From Swiss-Prot:
The modification N6-succinyllysine is found at K68. Its main location: cytoplasm. Optimum pH is 7.5. The gene is Txnrd1. ISGylated. Gene3D superfamilies: 3.30.390.30, FAD/NAD(P)-binding domain. Belongs to the class-I pyridine nucleotide-disulfide oxidoreductase family. The lineage of its organism: Eukaryota, Metazoa, Chordata, Craniata, Vertebrata. Pfam families: Pyr_redox_2, Pyr_redox_dim. This is Thioredoxin reductase 1, cytoplasmic.
Length: 499
């Protein structure tokens, strides 16, 4: 497509950002520091149930923030149980109040939404709650929720539209099921819940719902946590099952029917085996779909301006400077092909892009060795390669895996979950036993992983880990004493906190 044809002679803005999520807002605020005229277009298409939210994108409204807060609610429930062993006397049976939790979480989210609005205003970034769609070179149509249309032009555009939950395309899914977009503001307790999917979203939601006392079943098509280390994924699944979460494996729903309307009501789920003709039926109050997410790229006019997308996935291929095949259009965040779908990655990419475009910087976003955490009941933190990827990249004979179970001191008094927490480092034997994969399953896994991620960036070796003196008695010290290799088949069970 010829960019100059029909392009305006002058522009309304230096940069228009489509999407007011973490990445888009980070880029907007950074570009504004260089006295650039910046606009953010953000519009939330309501879910099939009508749920919508404010400025800030998935993470703040229907992702990391409410998820972590509800995970904390579940952890507090466990802490209350443990407290009896520490001398606390709880006279009454402790009950959980769903409505109070969601009200508190939504109040916090509302304060964040407002904070983003204020921050944009202070930085003189123009914000419009409108749906952006390209209509020609350097031109975009913004449509608000009343259908009013305005056309704006810009020298450059940044696509940061993110993703939304996928539906199954079966009878009753959009009519009767909820997604993570609905769950965190659900005005009633979901009751007996079926979670469909095995993504980190599915397992995190199943975990905190069970943690606050609900009857939870997870329906899994194939494997847990695809793309993550499968040794760790299976340990997570085992722990969840031991704590009362039921798993229906190798089944997919084929039909959702309403038996009784209400809040929550009753639903009948019919499911079919993925490897036989067997079908099953069961009743649930709520069905939560967490079967993946689709990029919001197909209805924003990209074909009009010639931006190429992966037709199968909707993802946008970009250069190492986040530039699409159309030179004046850039993209960041979850919509990028082959990149990690994580909030801090989008924020980093957005900031660095603005610094390169307007501040003379040459620093690019480093997508390697990015740490992340799955907030399942037993948290999983990781950085670098999974065991499978390490074998694929270096060969099984060229890696050494050091591992051990461990027992957090705080859990010894209530005497629970011994030899469930697990630590593993994967080393490249051909490169001075450099650590290429870091994995931890246990409490505060994110806090443990963050510091080690910096060490991995600096080229951490096993010898350096061994020469580091641990802090006692904490979970992270296990990484300074790992001595048993998987190859050896040696015993990795722990009998106490000092052994």
């Amino acid at each position: 497509m010829n960019d100059s044809k029909d392009a305006p002679k002058s522009y309304d803005f230096d940069l228009i950002i489509i999407g007011g999520g973490s990445g888009g807002l980070a880029a907007a605020k950074e570009a504004a520091k260089f006295d650039k005229k910046v606009m953010v277009l953000d519009f939330v298409t309501p879910t099939p149930l009508g749920t919508r939210w404010g400025l800030g994108g998935t993470c703040v409204n229907v992702g990391c923030i409410p998820k972590k807060l509800m995970h904390q609610a579940a952890l507090l429930g466990q802490a209350l149980k443990d407290s009896r062993n520490y001398g606390w006397k709880l006279e009454d049976t402790v009950k959980h109040d769903w409505e109070k939790m969601t009200e508190s979480v939504q109040n916090h989210i509302g304060s964040l939404n407002w904070g983003y609005r204020v921050a944009l205003r202070e930085k003189k970034v123009v914000y419009e709650n409108a749906y952006g769609k390209f209509i020609g070179p350097h031109k975009i149509m913004a449509t608000n929720n009343k259908g009013k249309e305005k056309v704006y032009s810009a020298e450059r555009f940044l696509i940061a539209t993110g993703e939304r939950p996928r539906y199954l395309g079966i009878p009753g899914d959009k009519e009767y099921c909820i997604s993570s977009d609905d769950l965190f503001s659900l005005p009633y307790c979901p009751g007996k819940t079926l979670v469909v999917g095995a993504s980190y979203v599915a397992l995190e939601c199943a975990g905190f719902l069970a943690g606050i006392g609900l009857d939870v079943t997870v329906m899994v098509r194939s494997i847990l946590l695809r793309g993550f280390d499968q040794d760790m994924a299976n340990k997570i699944g085992e722990h969840m099952e031991e704590h009362g979460i039921k798993f229906i494996r190798q089944f997919v729903p084929t039909k959702i029917e309403q038996i009784e309307a209400g809040t929550p009501g009753r639903l009948k789920v019919t499911a079919k085996s993925t490897n036989s003709e067997e079908t099953i039926e069961d009743e649930f109050n709520t069905v939560l779909l967490a079967v993946g997410r689709d990029s919001c790229t197909r209805t924003i006019g990209l074909e009009t301006v010639g931006v190429k997308i992966n037709e199968k996935t909707g993802k946008i291929p970009v250069t190492d400077e986040e530039q699409t095949n159309v030179p004046y259009i850039y993209a960041i965040g979850d919509i990028l092909e082959g990149k990690l779908e994580l909030t801090p990655v989008a924020i980093q990419a957005g900031r660095l892009l603005a610094q390169r475009l307007y501040g003379g910087s040459t620093v690019k976003c480093d997508y390697d060795n990015v740490p992340t955490t799955v907030f399942t009941p037993l948290e999983y933190g990781c950085c670098g390669l999974s065991e499978e990827k390490a074998v694929e990249k270096f060969g099984e004979e060229n890696i050494e895996v050091y591992h051990s179970f461990f027992w957090p001191l705080e859990w010894t008094v209530p005497s629970r979950d011994n030899n469930k927490c697990y630590a593993k480092v994967i080393c490249n034997l051909k490169d001075n036993e450099r650590v290429v994969g870091f994995h931890v399953l246990g409490p505060n896994a994110g806090e443990v992983t963050q510091g080690f991620a910096a060490a991995l960036k600096c080229g951490l070796t096993k010898q350096q880990l061994d020469s580091t003196i641990g802090i006692h008695p904490v979970c992270a010290e296990i990484f300074t004493t790992l001595s048993v290799t998987k190859r050896s088949g040696g015993d990795i069970l722990q009998s106490g906190c000092u052994g």
